[in-house]
Structure formats: structure tokens, C-alpha cells
Amino acid sequence: MKNKHQFFRIGLASPEQIRAWAERVLPTGEIVGEVTQPDTFSFGDNRPEKDGIFSEKIFGPIQTGVCACGKYKKQVEDEEEEEDSNFCKECGVEFVESRVRRYRMGYIRLACAVTHVWYLRNIPSYIATILSKPLQELENLAYCDHFFAGPVTNKPTLFGLKPSSFEYDEEDEFWNEIIPCFFYSFSYSPEFNEFMGREMATGGDAIQKLLANLKLKDIKDGIHREWKFFVNKKPTGDILEDLLIKRRKDFLVRRFKLIKFFIQTKTNPEWMVLSILPVLPPELRPMIRLNDGEIISSDINELYRRIIFRNNGLIDFLEKRTFTPEGVIVCQKKLVQEAVDSLFDNSMCKEPMTDLNGRLLKSFSDIIQGKEGRFRENLLGKRVDYSARSVIVVGPSLPLHQCGLPQEIAMELFQPFMIRNSIERNLVPSVRAAKLMIQNKLPFLWKILQEVMYGHPILLNRAPTLHRLGIQAFEPILADGRAIRLHPLVCAGFNADFDGDQMAVHLPLSLEAQAEASLLMLSQTNLLSPATGDPICVPSQDMLLGLYPLTIEVNRGIYGNRYNLSPSLRQIPYFYSYDDALRAKSQKLINLHSFLWLRWPVSDNLRILNSKDQEEPIEIQYDPLGNSHRIYEHFQIRKDREEKKLSIYICTTAGRTIFDQQIEAALQGFSKITPF
């Protein structure tokens, strides 16, 4: 049966969505899911505390079928009582399997909105980009160092009065005296606290209001108009002004892309500010008590506890707001913001949270990222059936779409297909006999292996798989040794080299998977980078180093005789074709760097790359019949008296002859090229 969910998407979640992940309704009508207490386990009976970060009522029982009271699920025959028997009426814990603690979530209702540190303090900052404000200004606002003055409510306010009805001149002595007196006289009164809550905003609440007031489509149209203005504007000639224009254009592109993504995914920008904080399932942040009484706990638990401590303190201050100075509430909001920042990325905080020994606590970012993170360590590197792994080595004689698969790996991967082929041919009576035959590695099995491998693609994967070229399909051929042979041109897509890198081999089983691998994932169909569109299969490193000595010149061509005392020993030989030149090289009559005259097809479109536009002949010879022989530095032409070309010879080397033949054969589509 196919799974219901075929894919998953990583993105921003709304507060309602986070609550929906965690909230459940008990048969009594009680809604559970909110974590309100920072306690973990009771030291008396070693049971999770109620409404704590390990609560059995929220996350499920520790033991299957056992509630927090220690009662077991009762077996009832009446269907009406069966629903009531699924949970304990005293403690509210459901009688379900303990594995639910691996995926049941909780949530913390924050007393104030806090900004998500990944979207605020990363570079580039998404919040700063979409608001088009300096990052430092937003950080001061998020951490309650600055206040946002404006019409927070829909009612007329002191700072929200229109200029037509209220004009405030800074030079007016009346307003300069009355406003400071107003703030000073009411700064410790309940009315002032109410005024501050209505007129001023700070912390995540202020940023949330700014994001909520954004009209994305209007901003998108404004960016489009401004971009047209800069496109039609010619360079000013001033280096500084042109640089500022370029930076502004780059910023417009970033902001336009970000807004477009928000519109396409139907995501609200204010979701980058958190009011509901999800709590991970307990099994993903375990807390273990050893035999000697020592407790080992995940750092995430301590970070959650600090958030709940500070959030509960802020709730108490807000409930007693009449008697609590506004400055104390603002400081507590800042502490909640810093605690949530430490949960997501402790390294970004100005004062990272540590344990009693001064060690930095590991946050979500530390657990997820890197080679030892959750994705690369536990999810991407899992072992699966019909797969293998080995070191890669260069296979320069292989075509681009083929790879050399070691015989030992091929025999193991294609074993089911070989068993079926052997039974269909009546070579063995049963599967067991076929496996025994394969273990003995009888000689005729290699022919069967080649038959089942023919036309069956394999997938090569090199971790980390950062883009789609990290997994490509190849046609396998048997190779000696225990290493996978790979064409050097495909290494750029894998970001691989031949210094000990390893690759995983996967075998597509179904016909659909084989067709997809052959049509979409074959290496010869993935020649362009998906990110930039530039060619990715280009020669580099060893290939360029090999082409250089193959095509290098070591003497002075036809001028070599000037510097040689024995001209007869330095005469340049003539060859009629590629084969003649390569045959002379194989007989060691010439070497790779020896100059030679190679006959070229007679054509009116002979193009010789030269530093001069029109090269003058070095020497012109005439015979009694009126035929001319013009000798140039890089070629020579024989013509009759009517200026009709009789023959053309070009000056080249044996190495360049080999290189040209290989390029010509590759362009004509030959799959096998004889090495020289």
C-alpha cells in the first residue's frame, strides 16, 4: 500500500498550525498539549511531572498501556465503555503504545511575541530585507532596546494624530516643556503603563505589527517600478554613485524574490515572529537516569526549561501589571527573547547559554547542521538493501554514460536477477541451489551477469547530496579490482575527486524506476548546472595537465634549422594522413612534440589561427609547369598556373594530431576511441 504522504515541505508554520500539531481533545472534552511547567521528573517516584516537558498526559505514557498512576488498561466487552477505558480518568493519560512519545508534540504559549533568530540575524536577514530597514535598527527593536512609536491600535492616539489636526514643532517652547513633564509625572502610575501599552511597542510585538501591516502585492509593484527606473538610467560616471545604484539594484532583486516566495507559498510574513513555540517529542530529547543516580539529559531540555521559567515570570508580571513597573516587564521580555534565541541557535546569541561547567548548550542548529547532524548522520547515511559502497578511481577510457562496477559488487547487487535468469533457463531447480551456485562463482555465471546487467542502469550517489546532480545514473560494465571506475568529466556534478572519495551504488528495481533513471538521470543528459545553466562537464585538473604536454611545442617549427648546425637531422617530415603520423609515432620515428607537415583536405575555407590578420608567405617556389608552392609559417599551399589549389599541408605536432583525432571522433558520436 502506498503511503499517503509522498513528499514533505519545509517552511514557515502559522501559530494555528503549531497548535494543531500538539493539541488533542480527551474523551472528557479537556484539551491537552500546552506545556506550562519547567519540571521534568519527580525525584520521589521518578515519574514525569504533570504539564511538564515530559508529561505523560501531553506526550503519552512511558510504558505501553500503563498510565501515570500505575494502572493498566482494562479489557472490557461493552463497546460503550471501551472508549472510556482508553484513558485514565484520574491522571488523564491515554492507554496507548509508548512509541507515541517519538512523534507527539507539545507547545508553549509565549506571553510576548519573539522574533525567530534564523530570520532576523542570519545574513542576509529576511526580516530586514522584507521590511527594508537596517538590521541594527531591527535588532535594537527586537531586544527591547528601542521603542516603536505609532498608531498601535485603531483608535486615535497621541503619536497617531494626523499633521492636519496636530502639528508638533520641535522648536515650540510649549511642547518642549509639556511633553517631558507628562512623561515624568506619570512614569510610575498605572495610567502611564496603559499609555505605554497603547502608544508604544517593542520587542517581537513591534516587529510582528510591522510585518502584519505589509501589503506584499503593492510592495512588489513598487519594486517593479523602481527597477524600471534604474534600468532606463544611464551610468553617471561617478564611481561612488554607480556603486550605490548597483547595491540598490541587488537589494531590490533580493527583496523581490523574497516577496514573490511569500506570495507563491501563501505564507504570511508575520509568521517569522513566534507567539506559539513548538516542543519536540520527548524521545528526541531524552533524559536518562543511570544506576548510580546520575542523570544524563539532552541540552534541549535545559533550554526549554529556561524558556518556561522566564515565560512564566513574564506572565506573573503581566497579571500584576498595575503594580509592576514597565521597565521590569520590558527586561523580562528581553530575557524571553534571548532564551528562545538560544533554543534555535545558541552560537548567534550575544551571551550564549552554558551549563554549570561553562560548556555551551547545543541548540537546534547544532543538532541539525554539519556532518554529525541529524540529516547527514541519521537520515541521509542510512543503509538500504540493493546498495553498495566503494572508493572511486578514474576510468579515462570509459564513455560518459558508463561506469566500471567491481565484479564482487555486481555479483551481489544483481543476485536476484541472476537467480531468476538461472531458474528460467532450467540451470538450477530452486532458489537455494541458485544461491549455492553463485557462492561458488562458477565460470559461466559471468556471462549471465553481463546479460542481466545489459540495459539495467545503476545510481551513483556521493554524500552530501546538495543538488540533483549528486545522484546520477550510469550504464554499468564489469571492472577488475574493488573500486568503482568513473569518467573524470562527471566528477564536477558530484563535487568528487580521486583522492579517496567514496560513492554509494543503488539498484533501481521497478520498471518505472529504471525508466526514470535511463531517461532523466543518465549522466550524459545532465551536462548543465541546474543553478546557473553553465556547462558542468568541463575538463579540469588532471585532464588539463594532460592536455598541456600533449599539445605543447618544444622547438621553433620551421625556424628550428636556424639554430641547428645539422639541418638534415632537423628536417620536418611529411605525412599523408592521421594514420601515417600515428604509425610513425608508434614506431618511435617521431615523438609527441615532433613537428610534422600533415596533408589537409583541399578547401576554400581554410582558417589558420594566427596572431596576424593576413600572413605573408615566407617563401614562394615555382616549377617549370608554372605551379606555385607557397610556404607559410603554419601551412603551405600548392597551386597550379590557374591558381587552383592542388594540396594543403599544415604544420602541427604528433600530440596535436592525436588530440584532434580524439575531438573529431567525439563530435561524430563514436563511443569507443582507440587509445594511443
UniProtKB/Swiss-Prot annotation:
Enzyme Commission number(s) from the entry: 2.7.7.6
Enzyme class label: transferase
Any single GO BP term: DNA-templated transcription
A molecular function (GO) term: DNA binding
Keywords on record: Chloroplast, DNA-directed RNA polymerase, Magnesium, Metal-binding, Nucleotidyltransferase, Plastid, Transcription, Transferase, Zinc
Cofactor: Mg(2+); Zn(2+)
SUPFAM superfamilies for this protein: beta and beta-prime subunits of DNA dependent RNA-polymerase
Predominant location category: plastid
Keyword Zinc: yes
Cofactor detail note: Binds 1 Mg(2+) ion per subunit. Binds 1 Zn(2+) ion per subunit.
Binding, Zn(2+): 67, 69, 88, 91
InterPro entries per record: DNA-dir_RpoC_beta_prime (IPR045867), RNA_pol_asu (IPR000722), RNA_pol_N (IPR006592), RNA_pol_Rpb1_1 (IPR007080), RNA_pol_Rpb1_3_sf (IPR042102), RNA_pol_Rpb1_clamp_domain (IPR044893), RNApol_RpoC1 (IPR034678)
Pfam families to which the protein is assigned, alphabetical: RNA_pol_Rpb1_1 (PF04997), RNA_pol_Rpb1_2 (PF00623)
Residues holding Mg(2+): 497, 499, 501
Cellular compartments per GO CC: chloroplast; DNA-directed RNA polymerase complex; mitochondrion
Annotated compartments: Plastid, Chloroplast
Catalytic reactions of this protein: RNA(n) + a ribonucleoside 5'-triphosphate = RNA(n+1) + diphosphate
Quaternary structure (record): In plastids the minimal PEP RNA polymerase catalytic core is composed of four subunits: alpha, beta, beta', and beta''. When a (nuclear-encoded) sigma factor is associated with the core the holoenzyme is formed, which can initiate transcription.
Summary of the function given for this chain in its UniProt record: DNA-dependent RNA polymerase catalyzes the transcription of DNA into RNA using the four ribonucleoside triphosphates as substrates.
Family: Belongs to the RNA polymerase beta' chain family. RpoC1 subfamily.
The protein, known as: DNA-directed RNA polymerase subunit beta'
Gene that encodes the chain: rpoC1
